[in-house]
Amino acid sequence: KKLLIIPIIIFLCFIAQIFYMGHINESFFYNLTQTQNPYYEIKNINFHKGFLNSKADFTIEDKYNLGLISKLDFKFNNNYFSKFIAQGKLSNPFKLLDDKLQNKELAWFKIQSIQNDLNVSIQFQDINLSNEGGNALWENVLTEILLDKEDLKIKAIYSKIGQVDFSQFYAKFYLKNLDHQQKFEKPISFSNLIQFNESVEEFKFDFCEINNHTISSFYNKNIIYFDDDNQTLKMHSQGKANNLNIDLTSQIYQSIDFDQINFDLIYSQKKPDISDDKLIFKPSNEELNLQIQNITLKKDNQDINIKGNIFLSRQSHKAHIQISSLKSPDEIFTWGQFFGGLNQYFIKNEEGMFIMDLHYDSDAKTQLKINGNEFTDINLN
């Protein structure tokens, strides 16, 4: 009899956790559907509780009368030991893609429990609209969202795109192996996702082409935070681009290329808010400031360094930028000969550095000065 008690207890515990997980999954689903969002509305909520599995669904409709409607179907696993809490699919809201998508499904998703968090993995279907007029292609698109289990707020988001190719006639955009991730200082709601939030953001890709302008690889890290008693938004941006080629053959009969570009920038503005009607970001005082800590352009084993500051507002524009190089600008940029040479805008200091010191002030009588000398009186407003 004692031997029979052990399997009975195990069986009862298994049944108990099934009922418990069924209750947890139902609570999670209804908490998810109660989420308020200014961009879409959740309708037609259904939950069908089962023993080992529960099924649920709801529809999402946009609030801008665009006719975008998508249905989310869930299959919950009422077993604590299942790898995934739920799996499901997202129907396609764009009618023009119906013929290109298997079962008219835009994406599939899986929800997995990770300690106190939930990881939502969304795999999108590949889309290929290529025809005689051009290409419209995206492949291997994946998004993962890390949610706080308690209030379903976003702690981090990660996206990956294997390939994007849009080309029509003479216009072309191609991107390969894009990775983007953002970790938030504090968990945020879905409705705040497009706002400025304190976070660390990383962005990289292997190759990009825009109308014959190419970059072989790119990496960027942004630290976004608020300063001055939470009233000023700042973004510290650092990164590099390799093998940049700008096709200017139609303008100066050749391309401008750099082996590498390193940058260190700080962008700041007064904390933006959202207008009540359009939900669009607006700087509160329309003042923007860009500090160029350093930009280094590398070409043929030579460095061109750029530092300075740019200030923009509705009332005035100001800029102070210094460009320096050990090598003569005309030797680095041979295309300058078409404009009388670039050396004329530089002075050579005692250390042998070629320097351009540029000042611009929209309020001054002489708006633009190069190396202290008046350049022109044109108005750049």
Question: Residue spans of the language-model regions?
Answer:
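Hydrophobic membrane-insertion alpha-helices, especially the h-region
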Residues: 2-18
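Glycine-rich, small/hydroxylated-residue low-complexity segments
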Residues: 13-15, 19-381
